[in-house]
């Protein structure tokens, strides 16, 4: 099956899921706001190795990345068993075979520390929080790729301490538009190991970096 057909078939499955997997219930809108929003900022990027998608929800962006970059091995994790099992079963049905699926909280995945070349997350939390939930799982020299909206400059300013403590540099800001909405992909590079992170989620929320 061609990549575009796979993407459209996947969208049909998640939009019509028997529970609220995504708030978007129109397939054309979902194609833009879920698939294109995930893939457009990656079109000129050379992604190699493996990737982790933190808080994948309805498989966004991980499934779309897996479809477009077949050579990448991906791991998708979500705290909702119902969501991750549905996404897994749809991928099996469609023959998407380069992805693994994990039910659990990311901060409890000790075995994932420094195992991934690329760590993605979309629409999970504000920047200073999601950095703590993603950076520890990237290899030194690996990238953390985070999708954000038009308020990203404020989030970057609020995340100055987190960026310093977690030993990352902002490598690039990819700006783009989806349905006249301003979007960015923030790309960080991990400079060095980081010890003691992530903390327990309640501590992260109570005392963000």
Swiss-Prot record:
Single GO MF annotation: rRNA (guanine-N7-)-methyltransferase activity
UniProt-listed InterPro entries: rRNA_ssu_MeTfrase_G, SAM-dependent_MTases_sf
PANTHER family: S-ADENOSYL-L-METHIONINE-DEPENDENT METHYLTRANSFERASES SUPERFAMILY PROTEIN
Gene name tied to this protein: rsmG
Keyword annotations of the record: Cytoplasm, Methyltransferase, rRNA processing, S-adenosyl-L-methionine, Transferase
Family affiliation: Belongs to the methyltransferase superfamily. RNA methyltransferase RsmG family.
Gene Ontology cellular component annotations, sorted alphabetically: cytosol
Localization, UniProt: Cytoplasm
Keyword Mitochondrion: no
Disulfide cysteine pairs (residue numbers): none
Organism: Thermosipho melanesiensis (strain DSM 12029 / CIP 104789 / BI429)
Protein name (database record): Ribosomal RNA small subunit methyltransferase G
Binding site for S-adenosyl-L-methionine: 55, 78-80, 106-107, 122
